[in-house]
Amino acid sequence: NRWLAAYTIVHGVEASPVERTAAGELQRYLETITGIRLPVTNAAAPPSPCEFLIGRTGRSFRADVAGLTDDGFAVRRCGGLTAIEGTCGRSTLYGVYYFLETYGGCRFYARDCEVLPSPEAFRLPDAIDDRCSPALSFRDVDWFEAHDAAFAAKLRINSDHNRVHNAAYGKTMHYAGDRFVHTFSAL
């Protein structure tokens, strides 16, 4: 995985707290998997041929999020550039977790149960062009583990029911007043 050492993680100059979390999570998981700690910088730094671009960076290489629904994201890779961008900051974080699952082989089963690939197994294809839109605008499960905002983000849950979210994990969706279920009468 020496090829990875040439990379930098780049977020926008005015990145939101959740986009900074997304860049930090990518850095943390790549370091845990490979032992290589990539630097994180903002887009004011000069471009390099090997970058992970997180969110709206202003760089010419980007992922196309046009036409995606709320919380949609896109992942694009060509050569040494990989862009992960969402329709909002929270969906950029979802895109990072999708990238780690789909191309990194990571599995997030519970707050204290994650399966990460061996360093030798971590490989990226030369080209990626994925676009993802959630089928449902409101997503939740009533499972104690998912009440943790950090773990809920890995599951791409956006409900505020029994969760205390903060700026690091993005805004949540509130639905049908203070109810979680049996909401028909509230509509």
Regions found by a protein language model. Give the residues of each.
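Acidic, contiguous N-terminal accessory segments
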Residues: 1-74, 120-129
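Feature activates predominantly on carbohydrate-active enzymes
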Residues: 17, 22-25, 29, 66-187
